[in-house]
């Protein structure tokens, strides 16, 4: 039976039992900020189970896309090494919201497994919670499972109700026993039944978990029975498919076999049993569906988990000999397998492939070099020793290797990793950042040697450079040892030192067994470049000769942003006027941030014009030209000198497109190298100073793609083409206003009706005055005021007090006194008297007052006390 057929039969079976088929929710949980990803079928129904949300149905069934990677639920490190761990899986489930309970849930499960899927009954074992006699009796007496195949599991995790067979959503809230169904693969496979010492073997495999939510647990641990118990079940599609297709490993089912074959095709591997192919087949599913749900590779949160999964897949491709982008080419194969069940995948397949290819290209630039670093480090690790934390950190920080990826590689080689050392290196970096760069304290170091010859305009790699000075913690030294932070001065360098708003370069200084990771480059004196970083290996001495290599990827992104800044500056002057002058800038690999003199926010039209002008220059693909000349000649030739910058007699003039500025920074060779220019923000930073931020190249492309994906999602939600969204949003807003008006009218009518009922049934007479005090359920304060006004007019002379308790425990109070009684009784006093009894306060005019409280339990007595309070004042 194919996986698609198994999924379809499951949903159709429960549909025939009165269940509504509910589509899979997003992998990004909509109602649970504590979850990184949707990891089970019940996540989208959590608020239904807790009573916060009502649905039009009481029975539901779904096939839920799920991810367990990152956060509390993380299977990433096990994928590729076990038969059943996945980052992405499908959870088949059926749910009852206060409708049926244990008997039906158990009978449905048994019927589906034995009659629809035709599994041999004698192959099925079940577990129940030790104290759940009800479930035990249903299995034994009604279903007919022999007692020897029903196992009671008690509290086996060290606390009351801490059991494999007792489920709870959190420390408090809905919870209850569960019953798990296991499939026996037979005696030829090692392992014992659940609860036995050999239960971790592979003979008995759990295929379905039936959770019976029948208790509410309070903070003290007390259990109260729920008035309407619920059912939540989950069965992994991949696991049941393995059973029905008579294979032992999930990776042998039809769905995975086709993806594994596709991975073999793209990597050129003939051995389909290779574990790396399993990893790639698993990871393409997780990565593709995460992108479908709007997640993009990044360095934080869900985006970083996606990046880790992609890079793990690429590393396994590299291990198989594939050094070129290949992962994105598996998307069509995935669509062929899962596009029918999940049409959202087919709809954005091109976008998914684009995002994956960009990530492949980004990581591919550093993967090979990083692997060489790792291979070299592993070759030096003595037997039984771990890989040092410094190397772990270098691979993470410089080469983009997630630490779990490096640990994965080490595990294959039988080497542990020094996580404590890695965390220590991370902490050092955090401390350096908090101090605005520990290394930057070295600016102004005493140095009496020759200036550094800068070769970085033409080359990113320079051999034979000589160490002319070394500094550790501000003190000049002759030698630096491995693990020390230091500043290295060279006689020549390709590293650009931070200047003119452009950040300094990063990279490596190497020679033999010496490796110095450059984290920043600054001028410690005019013309003297300090390479700030950490000696990761070897010993470094003054006079040593090194190979200096700049991080080319980072430099390329930085120069794109720097060159775009020049074009943007010129464009701003054209659009806003010649008064625009630079007031500050920051150019780094991620963006350009440009502060300029202007006294008003830019309009959307002005920003669009700036973008159009800059991108026109980019498309013109003009060559960049730099000349060195006298300062006076440069200014006479039209070169723009920047505010606040100091220039010598001789300056460097940069012509890029239509811009000419004095600039010593590094730049693209042609304007077309910028790729794409996009403004992402504009705002004020001081009086008369605006700040604009822009991105270029692959960052700009990714931003545009993200915005387009967001637009398409919005179009899907509003069921309108993207170009019609503004009109559709206006239409929805108008509909909302109309509905709000109708709701208000309905509330007014209901309030009037309720008021009539109260006037007839709840009014008492005290010394000739009509007194009405009542609690009327959940009514909003505005409607409550209207009711009090109506009752005053109808009953006068009268004193009226109405209270309404909301679902969130808040109490609204409104008191009213007719004008002829305000000399003796004040509405504000009345409301204050009642509010004080329910944990609140109130006040207002003599004839009308409002208040509130929070003690719902005290409300009935407080309302009942009004009659006596009025009597005492008449």
From Swiss-Prot:
- Cofactor(s) the protein needs: Zn(2+)
Q: Which domain of life is it from?
A: Bacteria
Identify the main location: cytoplasm
According to its UniProt record, the EC number is: 6.1.1.7
Cofactor: record remark = Binds 1 zinc ion per subunit.
The record's section on CDD domains has: AlaRS_core (cd00673)
Q: Name one GO cellular component term.
A: cytosol
Q: Which Pfam families match?
A: DHHA1, tRNA-synt_2c, tRNA_SAD
Give compartment(s).
Cytoplasm
The residues the record assigns to binding Zn(2+) are 562, 566, 663, 667
Per the UniProt entry, what are the Gene Ontology biological process annotations, in alphabetical order? alanyl-tRNA aminoacylation; negative regulation of DNA-templated transcription
Which Gene Ontology molecular function entries are recorded, alphabetically? Answer: alanine-tRNA ligase activity; aminoacyl-tRNA deacylase activity; ATP binding; tRNA binding; zinc ion binding
Catalyzed reactions per annotation = tRNA(Ala) + L-alanine + ATP = L-alanyl-tRNA(Ala) + AMP + diphosphate
Please provide the record's free-text comment about the domains of this protein.
Consists of three domains; the N-terminal catalytic domain, the editing domain and the C-terminal C-Ala domain. The editing domain removes incorrectly charged amino acids, while the C-Ala domain, along with tRNA(Ala), serves as a bridge to cooperatively bring together the editing and aminoacylation centers thus stimulating deacylation of misacylated tRNAs.
Similarity comment: family membership: Belongs to the class-II aminoacyl-tRNA synthetase family.
**NCBIfam families referenced in this protein's UniProt entry, alphabetically:** alaS (TIGR00344)
Free-text function comment from the UniProt entry: Catalyzes the attachment of alanine to tRNA(Ala) in a two-step reaction: alanine is first activated by ATP to form Ala-AMP and then transferred to the acceptor end of tRNA(Ala). Also edits incorrectly charged Ser-tRNA(Ala) and Gly-tRNA(Ala) via its editing domain.
Kindly provide the name given to this protein in its UniProt entry.
Answer: Alanine--tRNA ligase
Native species = Bordetella bronchiseptica (strain ATCC BAA-588 / NCTC 13252 / RB50)
